[in-house]
Amino acid sequence: MKKQKIRFYAALLCSSMVLSLVSMPVSAAETGQLTNPPTSTEGPGSPESASGNEAAAVLNGLYAALPVANGVKEVATADELTDALADSSISIITLKDDVEISSTLTVNRTVTLDLNGNVLKMTGSDSVIKVEADGDLTIQDRNTTTQHTFNPHCKYQFWYIDMWELDKDGSKIVSGGVITGGGGDQNNGGGVLVAGGTLTMAGGSIVGCSARSRGGGVYLAYDSATGKSGTFIMTGGSIIGCAAQLGGGVYVAPECTFAMATGS
């Protein structure tokens, strides 16, 4: 009888230990403080090793999903950036690398774009970003040390004035994240076209963007369809070497608002 009791309590103790070990990753996931997945020291063919590999696979899946679950997404391609802007569960988008786009990025919700020291370059002939009437975009830059070089004597094709162009052999250095290349032959808002929405610039630089008419860097427009006026709040960052017939840096259309606290 005593031996049976001993076996019973031993089995109960083992079960408790197993349950405790299994529950640890779940508890960590709930608190958002995942640690590195445990590794198995058993042989590759053992049941314990298979179980450990399955647990590691589950945790790796949690790691991959965690940034989106927290509302943060890192992107490294144009497609990833476009998809992230369309995903309302993502509130902060961080560039992991330089990204080239060929069509305008549209913002129609509240979202933050962290340039993270990288270059967002338009290779087409339109605005880099359009903030629509329902859009509220914040541009920030957590990495202000990465350096990019520009040629400051690129002649803008329509007005033949100096405009900065990204150039690995350029003489001008811009530190931190950069939005560049926008505009081409389009009329307004080469860097960012704010069509009734709100743009807050807290960091980064808009460099070498152009427009045939107004707002080489940023153009603030009134959206007649919604009755909303464009708003630009600048609390940091820079607009450099942009070109347009009117407002090479920023053009403010009637009924729109530009408030500048800091920045250049």
Regions found by a protein language model. Name each.
Residues 4-26:
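Sec-dependent N-terminal signal peptides of Gram-positive bacterial secreted proteins and lipoproteins
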Residues 24-87:
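Low-complexity, acidic Ser/Thr/Pro-rich repeat tracts that form intrinsically disordered stalk/linker regions
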Residues 75, 84-101, 111-116:
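Glycine-rich repeat segments that build the extracellular carbohydrate-interaction surface of secreted
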Residues 100-112, 120-149, 153-165, 171, ...:
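Extracellular beta-strand-rich solenoid/capping regions of secreted or surface-exposed proteins
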Residues 112-115, 136-141, 174, 198-206, ...:
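All-beta strand scaffolds that present successive hydrophobic residues in beta-strands
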Residues 1-5, 41-42:
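N-terminal secretory signal peptides that target proteins for export/translocation
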